[in-house]
Amino acid sequence: KDLAKIVMPNELFFNIIDQATEMGFDDFGLTPITGEIFMDKRFFEKLEYLETHPKVSSYHFFTNFTVLDAAAILKLTALKKLSIFSISVYGHDQSSFVHITQRNDIAYRRLVDNLQTLHQILAQADLQIEIGWRTYKSFDHITEGDDYGLSRSVIRLRDSYDIPLHITKNYDNWGGIITDKDVNGLDLDVVDCQSMPKIGACSLIFYKLQVMADGQVNACACRDVNATLAIGDLSSQRLADILSDRNQTYMDLIDSQQRGEFKPICHSCSFYRSIYKYHPVYEYHSKPQTTLEEVYETLERA
């Protein structure tokens, strides 16, 4: 990532929520495109704003679960509008965790401790959780032995509380940013999508946009880490004017993708979802189908 690592100020966050809810948005994804959400020392203040906002119905986020402590995990159980939080686990033991994440043994120990703490808390509290597990392709769910505290903790959570567990052994190329050279020496495969056909605009630029920490509005919340698909800036524009057919930058992006013209980050992206193909992931997330004409009508009303 080339952009500076910054944390969104609370005042900007509050303003975004106010503008978005006035437009009719009521569910919010809080995960930054890169980085750990709990690195924001004031994150719980943001959550409190969402909890007390009359027009916010729900929110969700991902975490690598290495930054929290027991007190923070317990605070999550008091959140009424948290629809689900997803834990991203990398590796299956200390060695694989360190090699994949480039973090140290302290971070590994903290992750295992937090998973064990979560297991204890869930015996007395109700939290909607899912776990995404990414590790070596040769891993076969070993849980025995002193070095398998991580895999043992993950399996125990799944079995004890029926937590959805999604295991991935193919790694995304992040729009061509990640290549096989980046995982050299690791038992990992990077998905190569240089030849993936792209027909029509990507559906993500219609429903999965993101406000960056600096106020830029980016048309992709999934893989465009450097905001090359930015369509506006809240430091000088209203959100209603950015998500509108009055915003020529946004309209040009849609039109160019409809013509089959994709920017470099999109050309190599393995996360592309054509508006002309209903993807199975939408069934999992219960996404209703919307036509392009209906989208244009919505933007016209903004």
List each model region and its residues.
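Short cysteine/histidine-rich metal-coordination sites, predominantly Zn2+-binding motifs
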Residues: M8-L12, V281-V295
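Iron-sulfur (Fe-S) cluster-binding modules
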Residues: L299-A302
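C-terminal accessory region of radical SAM enzymes
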Residues: N114-Q116, Q120-E130, I155-P197, Q216-V217, ...
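Short, small/polar residue-rich loop motifs at catalytic or cofactor-binding pockets
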Residues: C202-I205
